[in-house]
Regions:
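Phospho-regulatory, low-complexity terminal regions
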Residues: 1-94, 99-100
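Glycine-rich tight-turn/loop motif centered on a GG-T
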Residues: 381
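Long, Pro/Ser/Thr-rich low-complexity/intrinsically disordered regulatory tracts in eukaryotic proteins
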Residues: 74-377, 386-454
Length: 454
């Protein structure tokens, strides 16, 4: 198995760059950073934002409303796709005088292009995280504080000079919203949980990164068919399926008919409305003759193609080089990728004895791949779990007044639900370990709130 994505290789070797640092270096070569930064600073200057990092990510994530564009005299060439990062500098109307020429020097550009934190995070990471979580603050919070402070220190003077602001009074975004010791996130928009009326549901959203797991294929949705065909060509080469004939511009119907001929099952589905951009996905499964190898390929929009199609019949050099020197199927890789998720599920089952099912009365759950990771969202319906006679006000009071409340803001972003004021939402960072989450379940719910889910 190719280990280039395995960060464990670098734990004891500080001289080697991390996978994230290599990704950042590649990004600087692949993208026109100058154009992206032009957009960012143009928007910040015209918005006169005192929280520039939030404004920057919102703009680059394509989240500006039409009204906001009119307010700031920004004209974006059509077609403008919702939640799609803008990669070309905006065209400004005649009555909109850009301040960039005066304040944005080559020296500033040079600093912004090369400034990468010690953790390797860069502008690309921030944009992508917001794409993966377009309606959730998690897209902003996952950037480490060290990076945000460095970026902010570079463009804050530009904003202050342009708007005659005192740099000492300009809001320091990172210092108030990040735990700089543990580099974990806290709420960007602190809600008053006491304002959540009639608490009836609690939702947990737990995220995990899959950047180290090469079984996930990230494909551009516009080139979906072409990429599927390329993957099938690779499978064909490995398995020598002579009767497999392909077309570069194969439509969905032809593709499905072709797959059926070679014992493939294909399942097309959309996780959400495509306008929300929470990833349109396709799944292809292959069953080998010995019923032992299952190929599961998830096609997620954008980013990169990771080609690792290990079949039981294909023991190439990469497979031979794995540490156990054993034959490895793609099914083994798939199972290994979700060990962490399985551990989490087992921990929850161990403590509370409920089945982790998609519909289990008071408990519903959903697993979704999101960009470079996956999330598992679990919603507990307190009304069904505890009954109508339960004292929800007392439960809410315990949540708010617990001396452990602040402790767990380092583990979960605790907020309300935009669409329902009866739901309390706990959103985890990928940096949080399963042990910390398990501790949260036991200590917060069992010891503090007195709830036992059995």
């Amino acid at each position: 198995m190719n280990n280039k994505y395995n960060r464990d290789n670098y734990i004891n070797d500080k001289d080697k760059p991390s996978e994230r640092q290599m990704s950042a270096e590649n990004y600087l070569k692949e993208y026109n950073i100058k154009e992206i930064l032009t957009e960012m600073i143009n928007y910040i200057l015209h918005k006169k934002s005192k929280s520039p990092i939030v404004s920057m990510i919102k703009y680059l994530g394509g989240l500006l409303t039409e009204k906001e564009r009119q307010d700031y005299n920004i004209s974006i060439p059509d077609p403008q796709i919702d939640y799609h990062p803008i990669v070309d500098p905006p065209k400004f109307k005649e009555n909109c005088n850009s301040l960039l020429k005066e304040y944005l020097t080559d020296e500033i550009f040079s600093n912004l292009m090369t400034k990468i934190s010690k953790y390797g995070i860069n502008m690309r990471d921030l944009i992508r995280l917001n794409k993966e979580f377009p309606k959730n603050n998690i897209g902003i919070m996952l950037g480490d504080a060290d990076s945000l402070k460095k970026f902010e220190s570079l463009y804050k003077p530009i904003i202050c000079k342009a708007h005659n602001l005192d740099i000492n009074n300009l809001k320091d975004y990172t210092s108030n919203n990040f735990n700089l010791v543990n580099l974990e996130f806290k709420d960007i928009k602190k809600i008053n949980i006491e304002d959540i009326k009639g608490l009836k549901k609690i939702t947990f959203s737990i995220s995990r990164n899959l950047v180290d797991f090469p079984f996930v294929c990230f494909l551009n949705i516009e080139n979906r068919t072409e990429n599927i065909v390329k993957q099938l060509q690779e499978i064909d080469r490995v398995k020598s399926i002579k009767d497999l004939k392909r077309k570069e511009n194969m439509n969905k119907k032809d593709l499905m008919n072709l797959l059926r001929k070679i014992n493939y099952d294909i399942d097309f589905w959309d996780t959400v409305n495509p306008s929300d951009n929470l990833i349109r996905k396709q799944r292809i499964t292959y069953q080998s003759n010995n019923d032992e190898t299952i190929v599961l390929i998830n096609f997620c929009n954008n980013f990169q193609i990771i080609k690792n199609l290990f079949l039981e019949e294909n023991h190439n050099e990469e497979v031979k080089d794995n540490q156990d020197n054993k034959k490895q199927s793609l099914n083994d890789i798939f199972i290994g990728c979700f060990n962490e998720l399985s551990d989490l599920i087992r921990n929850v089952q161990y403590y509370y004895g409920f089945e982790f099912d998609h519909n289990f009365g008071y408990l519903t759950s959903d697993i979704a791949l999101l960009g470079r990771g996956f999330s598992i969202t679990t919603e507990i319906d307190l009304d069904k779990l505890l009954g109508n006679d339960f004292d929800y006000d007392k439960l809410q009071e315990k949540i708010v007044k617990s001396d452990k409340f602040d402790k767990y803001t380092d583990i979960f972003n605790i907020s309300g639900n935009d669409n329902d004021d009866n739901i309390l939402v706990f959103t985890s960072s990928p940096k949080i370990s399963n042990e910390s989450i398990s501790e949260f379940f036991v200590e917060y719910f069992e010891k503090i709130l007195g709830l036992k889910f059995i």
